[in-house]
Regions:
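Catalytic cores of alpha/beta
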Residues: 1-11, 17, 26, 95-131
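Ordered, small/hydrophobic-rich secondary-structure cores
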Residues: 52, 58-113, 117, 140, ...
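Alpha-helix N-cap/helix-start and coil->helix boundary motif
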Residues: 22, 47, 116-117, 138, ...
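A broadly tuned preference for mixed-charge, low-complexity surface segments
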Residues: 45-51, 91-93, 127-137
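C-terminal helical cap(s) of enzyme catalytic domains, especially alpha/beta-barrels
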Residues: 27-34, 39, 101, 120-154
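Conserved anion-binding
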Residues: 2-86
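Short, basic, helix/turn surface patches
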Residues: 40-50, 107-114, 134
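Flexible "arm" and connector segments at domain edges
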Residues: 37, 136, 149-184
Length: 184
């Protein structure tokens, strides 16, 4: 908990817990009890089963079961990555995201495979909370200005932007200014 405390007490607005969700859900519950909406959970799945420890370990826990458990302990935001799609620029796993969005009331952020403006539009139309665009920005597959306009103009769901005042986040390499990731 010391690391979570440190980040949240020193200006970081949200901490994402990944492997801890499957390996130590009690820790996640304590963190959520203390920090509420400032704790999000990252669920990475390989063939629908949750992976941990940098994707080295695949558990016997289904991603929907973990999401439901996290919702029960108070997690409000889940970042979902289909490992097979991550970095492949082949589009997100919309079906798994749709199932996840229907299974829990948590805010769902898509990660993995988002490669075009059309992918962003499809995810928005699925009423997801957001999307992480990594490699597509790095390779130029997504126009940053268009992505931001789509996110701010229509918003994934306007109510979320109004309620939480979320803004797209852009991650850049400090020395070169190269855009590395956009989270909208």
């Amino acid at each position: 908990m010391e690391t979570v405390d440190y980040y949240l007490q020193n200006g970081i607005s949200r901490v994402i817990l990944g492997s801890a969700a499957v390996k130590n859900p009690r820790f996640v519950e304590r963190a959520v009890g203390k920090y509420r909406d400032q704790i999000a959970v990252g669920i990475d799945a390989r063939n629908e089963m949750v992976a941990a420890e940098g994707w080295l370990d695949t558990s016997n826990v289904h991603y929907l079961d973990l999401a439901k458990k996290m919702e029960q302990i108070g997690v409000k935001t889940i970042i979902f990555t289909d490992i097979a799609k991550d970095g492949m620029l082949q589009g997100p796993n919309v079906e798994q995201l749709r199932q996840l969005n229907a299974a829990v009331s948590c805010n769902i952020i898509a990660s993995g495979g988002v490669s075009t403006i059309e992918d962003i539009r499809r995810l928005r139309d699925e009423r997801l909370y957001g999307a992480i665009c990594g490699k597509a920005l790095y390779t130029g597959g997504i126009d940053l200005q268009k992505a931001v306009f789509l996110a701010k103009g229509n918003a994934f769901t306007d109510k979320y932007f109004q309620k939480s005042e979320l803004l797209p986040a852009i991650v850049q390499e400090a020395s070169t200014g190269q855009v590395l990731m956009l989270a909208i």
